[in-house]
Regions:
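Glycine-rich phosphate-binding loop plus the immediately following alpha-helix
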Residues: 96-114, 147-184
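Glycine-rich phosphate-binding loops at beta-strand->alpha-helix junctions
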Residues: 21, 192-224
Length: 239
């Protein structure tokens, strides 16, 4: 979504924490990249200490910044992590916003990673939804460009007591194989359309490239870099 023209000339350090990789990029006030995307593998046993050590290594490679935007794979409220199913239990109740502000002396906003990615893609009209297909399953929904907080479709029961993430996350892809996974995804898309009445759906994440069925005109596969590019827009919305 286009940024407001009144936005001050502030550079945003965007961080995308994922189950397999930690990425950063520096954006200008218009949301355009000032650096290439930098990446390190998510550490084994990904505790806050280990993941933040990787973030620090990446941060050392970028120029000065004015503020920080973080996308995190779980439920986030006011900078505090409430769920981290694909990382480590130590993340639960960890105040990531406060920790980074203390370290870097810069203002920080933290939000669900799918929500941040969606900000880079949405048009700000009607009901729009994003599903991210990666290590887990991310989800976010927006009305007229505003995020509806709290959606965590991944762990909602779907088929025979198993969750959407059980089928559509990385483990589900490996278990069921590409053909079955695509059928499950098509079914999930139909379910979300009936439940949320979205007008536009965006599909992101590393496994979006594995989609092999024809998508309707109002369904769009988006770049994985949008997980970083949405960071500047996060500063124009409530986190």
């Amino acid at each position: 979504m286009a940024l407001k023209t009144s936005e001050k000339a502030l550079n945003t350090l965007c961080i995308d924490v994922g189950g397999t990789g930690v990425k950063i990029m520096l954006l200008d006030s218009a949301g355009k990249p000032l650096t290439e995307r930098l990446r390190l593998p998510t550490p084994e046993d990904p505790t806050p200490t280990r993941v933040l050590a990787a973030v620090e290594k990446l941060k050392a490679q970028v120029p000065k910044f004015d503020r920080v935007a973080v996308g995190f794979p779980g439920v986030v409220k006011h900078g505090v992590i409430y769920t981290a199913a694909n990382l480590h239990p130590e993340w639960v109740n960890f105040n990531l916003q406060t920790e980074l502000e203390k370290r870097w002396k810069k203002p920080v906003r933290v939000a669900n990673d799918a929500a941040v990615q969606g900000y880079a893609a949405i048009q700000g009209k009607g009901v729009e939804m994003i599903l991210t297909l990666g290590t887990g399953l991310g989800s976010a929904i927006y009305t007229e460009g505003h995020l509806c907080p709290g959606l965590e479709l991944a762990h909602h029961p779907w088929i025979k007591g198993k969750t959407y993430e059980d089928f559509l996350g990385k483990r589900g892809f490996k278990k069921y194989g590409p053909k079955r996974w695509n059928k499950l995804l098509a079914s999930a898309i139909q379910q979300t359309a009936a439940t949320f009445n979205w007008e536009q759906l965006y599909l992101g994440g590393g496994n979006a490239k594995e989609i092999h069925f024809k998508l309707d005109k109002n369904i769009q596969v988006i770049s994985n870099e949008d997980g970083l590019l949405g960071g500047a827009a996060l500063w124009q919305h409530d986190s």
